[in-house]
C-alpha cells in the first residue's frame, strides 16, 4: 500500500481505518488490515539514554542484565528483554525518540488532506475525513504516554483477577514513565 511509503504515522492510520467498515468498502478494509509496522529498530544507545533519563538512574542500578538488541520494533516504540536486580525477567518498552514531533507533523499533513477531501471531493464529506483524523490524533497521541498504557494494563489485570481464561502480565509501576514501561516477560 502507498501508506507504507509515507511512514509509521500513516501506517498506524491505515491500521485504525481497517476497523472502520462503516466508512470504507470491504476491499479497502482488507488492504488496510494488511498494513504492518515494518519499522527498523532505533539505536540501542538511545534506548538506554531514554531509560536512564526517565528513571533518573543508571541502567545497571535497575537491571541485572539488559539485551541491547530489541525483541521487536514498531512505529511508536521498541521492546527490549531485561532482568531486574531481583531476578525477575521483564520486557522494557521504550518510546522512539522524537516520535511525537514526527507524528504531529504527519497529522498536520493529514488534516490538510482531510479538509481538501471534505471540501473538494464529490461525496467527500460523507467519509467525515476531518473527524476521522481528529479521532486518530487523540488516539495516537495517547499511545505515546506509557503511563496511560500502564494504568490501562493494571485496570485490565484487576478486571481479570482470578480468571483462568486470561493472564495479564504484571506491570512494574515503579519503572513506568511517559517514555518507558517495564512489565513481566
Predicted regions and their residues:
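Broad phosphate/nucleotide-binding scaffolds in NTP-utilizing and phosphate-metabolizing enzymes
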Residues: 1-185
Amino acid at each position: 500500500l502507498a501508506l507504507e511509503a509515507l511512514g509509521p504515522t500513516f501506517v498506524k492510520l491505515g491500521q485504525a481505518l481497517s476497523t472502520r467498515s462503516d466508512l470504507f468498502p470491504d476491499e479497502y478494509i482488507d488492504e488496510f488490515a494488511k498494513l504492518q509496522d515494518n519499522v527498523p529498530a532505533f539505536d540501542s544507545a538511545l534506548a538506554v539514554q531514554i531509560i536512564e533519563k526517565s528513571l533518573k538512574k543508571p541502567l545497571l542500578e535497575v537491571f541485572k542484565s539488559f539485551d541491547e538488541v530489541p525483541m521487536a520494533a514498531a512505529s511508536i516504540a521498541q521492546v527490549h528483554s531485561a532482568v531486574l536486580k531481583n531476578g525477575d525477567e521483564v520486557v522494557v518498552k521504550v518510546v522512539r525518540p522524537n516520535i511525537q514531533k514526527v507524528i504531529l507533523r504527519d497529522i498536520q499533513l493529514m488534516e490538510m488532506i482531510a479538509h481538501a477531501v471534505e471540501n473538494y471531493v464529490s461525496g467527500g464529506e460523507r467519509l467525515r475525513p476531518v473527524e476521522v483524523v481528529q479521532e486518530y490524533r487523540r488516539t495516537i497521541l495517547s499511545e505515546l504516554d506509557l503511563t496511560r498504557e500502564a494504568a490501562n494494563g493494571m485496570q485490565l489485570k484487576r478486571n481479570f483477577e482470578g480468571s483462568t481464561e486470561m493472564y495479564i502480565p504484571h506491570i512494574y509501576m515503579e519503572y513506568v514513565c511517559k517514555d518507558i514501561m517495564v512489565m513481566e516477560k
